[in-house]
């Protein structure tokens, strides 16, 4: 089957934003204008097409990033049909993992900001993730019809808070209730959308006289930004020649692809204004799969030779699984992005990460939670496969005869855990199955059994994250669970270097004995300097410990790191240097050296000024001005460090760093302090030494 849409007319984009910027409504409008959806689904009444889990519709927030395919030929039907694959990404900080994994497979992104709230803390997190994957992006300033809407103020915040170079493509005509349309700064015309047909048709008109001067000024800014794309254009511009519309668009596109500028559009998705022109900007300025660098990977040749795959149907098949979802009707759905080649339903592919072959039974293209079965997918496509058995998020799928392992994704460590137990014994097995499935879907969610208490522990990125997991167990798997108190993921570390710590394990009373003897130095590592949080240096000279026992010493220490001597929490940022010891020809063994190493570690750890580390969260609270004092006082009582505050249209934004252990139940307290008028967001920032009294209480509670 031949390709129906040339790859140059593909756009794989994400729609990304903070909570309440109106991202889901924006996506709904995209689906409406591209002709997929004939009745607009509003978030207000829980009917939005992209929010397809029940909890999302109840809570009005987007949890799972659903992928949808749509076609767009332009507002004035000025293009050949372009295939736009949209990945909707959640804005809540507990679901940062969803944003991270969608950024990994996108070619471009639309950042949605609220014209009133502007750039929020969550916007900064998403921005950093987009920077990490070098995703070209444009911005859409939404909610121009709301009280306090100010387009140019948000443009200023994109520059100041995100360190970006924003270039407005449009200006808003009016604001709040008086918002009627936009000025197109490329064409220098006003665009007015027709309210009678929900904005499907529009007219170009003259720029309102009172805006002409402002429009000229920002048009000049746009032309200058375009001219900076090349010396040739700059010479033309400085020579006083006019740049053509085509030259402007081509130059700006190049600068967006190079991540040098962020083009900014505006509108009100709710009022059916602006989304249409933003879609045109997606086509004009965001990359096709062929515009972004080839994907890197490693060949399976025993030497890990670097290789790459280009967005080309003729190259061998390669794809990345970026999301696993459980569908009530068909079981496992594996969402994947094809980077190169072609695959047909019925084909067998290799998962080199698991060394397992998988058969593509059925391939579907998703429209939110509706699906259309297709026979093949090609380079640039995003689709879902039904029935893949052992694939997890981040795995590669490739041609078995041309094996490549694509770059893996990075997933954060959970910061909060709770114990869960089924309400009835009969649910025990069902709960295990449910948690296993959910963990497969979500790599930032972990499940394990506590060896001491035999309880099932679940861990994730925040209270809301775990609430939703428990909720999904009940809804999707019919398992009711009792939930324990949230537990903080503390860590242990040392603060000073200790040298010549000896560990000896010797049992030599006739027959074959046991003998292992090590001498080590222990030292703290700079936090974050080593991704594993541990380094082992073998400095043995003259064979005082034979080479075959060295790995056992390393292993003995690593086993101790899982549960530190202070309170049984994992040990991080530790370096160990093995430099002396002794062995016995007959009695030495790997086990003896493992035990000797663990004895040395325990002794050294106590002497090296051990500390308990607690997770510190970056907290931002938006509150009405009259409640500022109460909110700050409450954060201080929670051992919060204030990092500044600023005023905005709706009140005051307070920035603070607060230990996670002090933030449980904060939402309820904030509601009562401000009569429900404040909101907050929180994300993990760093680990820091817990004060003595806190550390003591934690250690005592752990019964150490």
Curated annotation (Swiss-Prot):
Family matches, as Gene3D superfamilies: 3.30.230.10, 3.30.70.240, Elongation Factor G (Translational Gtpase), domain 3, P-loop containing nucleotide triphosphate hydrolases, Translation factors
Domain of life, source organism: Bacteria
UniProt: GTP binding residues: 17-24, 88-92, 142-145
UniProt keyword Cytoplasm present: yes
Disulfide topology: none
Location within or outside the cell: Cytoplasm
Single GO MF annotation: GTPase activity
The keyword Protein biosynthesis is assigned to this record: yes
Domain tr-type G: 8-290
Function in brief: Catalyzes the GTP-dependent ribosomal translocation step during translation elongation. During this step, the ribosome changes from the pre-translocational (PRE) to the post-translocational (POST) state as the newly formed A-site-bound peptidyl-tRNA and P-site-bound deacylated tRNA move to the P and E sites, respectively. Catalyzes the coordinated movement of the two tRNA molecules, the mRNA and conformational changes in the ribosome.
Cross-referenced HAMAP family: EF_G_EF_2_B
Family to which the UniProt record says this protein belongs: Belongs to the TRAFAC class translation factor GTPase superfamily. Classic translation factor GTPase family. EF-G/EF-2 subfamily.
Protein name: Elongation factor G
Organism: Pectobacterium atrosepticum (strain SCRI 1043 / ATCC BAA-672)
Higher taxonomy: Bacteria, Pseudomonadati, Pseudomonadota, Gammaproteobacteria, Enterobacterales
